[in-house]
Regions:
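An N-terminal hydrophobic leader/cap segment in hydrolases
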Residues: 1-16
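Conserved HGGG/HGGXW glycine-rich cap/lid loop of the alpha/beta-hydrolase fold
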Residues: 22, 27-75
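Conserved alpha/beta-hydrolase catalytic His-Asp/Glu region
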Residues: 24, 166-234
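Conserved catalytic-core motifs of eukaryotic protein kinase domains, centered on the activation segment
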Residues: 51-53, 76-82, 142-143, 249-250
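Conserved acidic catalytic loop of the alpha/beta-hydrolase fold
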Residues: 87-104
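Conserved hydrolase catalytic core segment
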Residues: 101-146
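Conserved loop-alpha-helix segment in the C-terminal half of the alpha/beta-hydrolase fold
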Residues: 231-270
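Catalytic active-site module of serine/aspartate enzymes centered on a nucleophile-bearing elbow/loop
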Residues: 261-295
């Protein structure tokens, strides 16, 4: 048996929930604790529940741990439609209400962080707390963009057309391109395994995956992060992979503190996906923070 096959056998079994007449994939591990909230782990763009397998394994002895594939990603359905933060916010909120059955600690990476923040701000009855890991989403007072480059605008408009978008999708889902992208956003290259590349590529082979890819890039921006923080009341933990080339974590961290001073944050030697790159550190910090909420 290969190392990949051995690792796969230690993952929580797939389960499915029907939402809006579509099949939504999730996993659950661990036992409910009366005095501890369940965890709900939410992946980033192009990822899935598979990206959390190290965290599920490390946290399931202390918590009931759920992870879900957002509609359009992973093993969840990929119907034609508009994909946006409001869709995933509704999905997460209704999943907590219907399947988990009590408020959860939402932990989200990148796009999943933004969707989780939307739930915590707009549906406080679903959120016992929020953990953000290199979360996506702009602030209202972000620096104004430079004068638009007409060539860049033309390229963007062309790429949003069906054929160029499809060709771009075919390119970015190649294993060699996935590996190259991971090499850009992971500091520890040993964490970039064949298994990880396969986990990211597999959903891109599903019918509808190319349309989801195009729809996400066409979707309008949702609520700004500061607007969401001003509505939120639950505890907040932020874990930054400080080596992330896609965001200035220190500057973004200062913005979060400006709008939500009562937070806990840690900066880790990792890239865009600290939960997968340094899972032991993330699991320890998350565990200690959640257990400390009731004290």
């Amino acid at each position: 048996m290969t190392a990949t096959a051995v690792a796969a056998t230690h993952r929580a079994p797939s389960q499915y929930w029907t939402w809006r007449d579509q099949s939504i994939h999730y996993v659950v591990a661990g036992e409910p604790h009366p005095s501890r909230p369940p965890l709900l782990l939410v992946h980033g763009f192009g990822a899935s529940t598979d990206h959390w397998h190290k965290n599920i394994r490390g946290l399931q002895s202390d918590f009931e741990v759920w992870a879900i594939d957002l509609m359009g990603f992973g093993r969840s359905a990929k119907p034609n439609g508009d994909y946006s933060g409001s869709l995933w916010q509704a999905q997460l909120h209704e999943f907590i209400q219907e399947k988990i059955g009590r408020p959860a600690i939402l932990a989200g990476n990148s796009l999943g962080g933004y969707a989780s923040l939307c739930v915590a701000a707009n549906h406080p009855e679903s959120a016992a707390g929020l953990v953000l890991l290199n979360s996506a989403g702009p602030f209202s007072d972000a620096a104004p963009a430079a004068k638009p480059n007409p060539v860049a605008k033309l390229i963007q408009s062309v790429m949003l057309q069906p054929l160029p978008s499809w060709l771009l999708f075919q390119y970015v889902r190649q294993p060699s391109v996935i590996r190259r992208t991971l090499n850009q956003v992971y500091l520890d290259k040993s964490a970039i395994t064949d298994e990880l590349v396969a986990d990211i590529r597999r959903p891109s082979c599903d019918p509808g995956a190319a349309q989801v890819f195009a729809s996400v890039f066409k979707s309008r921006q949702g609520e700004k992060v500061d607007e969401l923080l001003q509505k939120m009341t639950c505890p907040l933990l932020i874990l930054w992979g400080e080596g992330d080339p896609w965001m200035n974590c220190r500057a973004k961290g200062a913005k979060f503190r400006q709008y939500y001073p009562d937070l806990t944050e840690h900066y880790l030697q990792a890239g865009h996906c600290p939960h997968d790159e340094v899972p032991d550190q993330v699991n320890s910090l998350l565990r200690d923070w959640v257990l400390g909420l009731g004290k």
